[in-house]
Amino acid sequence: ISSRKASNPVIQSMNDKYHVDFSGMSIDELNKFIDKMKDEDQTRASGNLLNNTQLAWLAAAQIARDKGYECAALMVEFSVYNIDYSESVTDSSTPLLDKLNTTTVFNNYKNKVLNSGLKDFSGGSWSFTIQKSDNADLFYALHRVSTSGTGFMIGNSIMYYLITVHDTFDFAYDNNYDDLFTTTVNNWAWLCQQTHVLNPIEINLSTAIG
C-alpha cells in the first residue's frame, strides 16, 4: 500500500516548508520511521525542521490516511502544525462535510433546522454528537459539535439556511483515538505519550441547507 500526498493544499504547503514527504512509503515503512523517531527521541526543531515527535505524528497521520481515515489524518496534521481547520461548501475539497452529509444524525439535524422556522439559531439545543456508528473516520475528527445558522427568506418563507458546524479538536484531552492507532501504529504506547506536540485547533464547517 503506497502513501498518498496530502490532499489538503494547506498541509501540502506546510509539508513542503518543513521538507516532509511520506509519499511512496508503505505502512510498514512509516512504522519503521516512527520507531526511528522513538529511538532517537531528541528535539531538533529549529527554523525549517520539525522535532522527532512531530514527525512521528505526521507519519501516524499518513498511516491513518492509508487505512481510509482521511478526516482523522487531516485533523492530526493540522494539530501538529497548529493551524485551525475550516471547510466551506464552495471549497473544491470538503472531506468532513462530505462524510457529515451521509450521517443520519446530521440529516436529522437538518430536518430539525428546516422545520424550526427560526431566522437565527445557536446554542446548546443545536448541538449533536458524532458516534462511531455514524461514521468511524468522522468520529475521530468531530465529537460533540455546536452549530449556528441564519435563514434567508423569499417573501414570508425561509428558503435556505447558512449554517456553521463548530468543534475543537484536542487530541491530548480526548481519549477516543486509541482504537484508531493501536491496530495501525506499532509503537503507539510511546506515541500516545507524546501528545505535547499536538495543539488544540478550532474546526469550522460552513454549508447551506434548504
What do these predicted regions represent?
Residues 11, 158-160, 192:
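Generic structural signal for short, flexible, solvent-exposed coil/loop and linker residues
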Residues 166-210:
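Active-site or metal-binding loop neighborhoods of secreted/extracellular toxin and effector enzymes
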Residues 1-148:
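Membrane-inserting hydrophobic helices used for pore formation or membrane fusion
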Residues 129-177:
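Acidic, glycine-rich flexible loop segments
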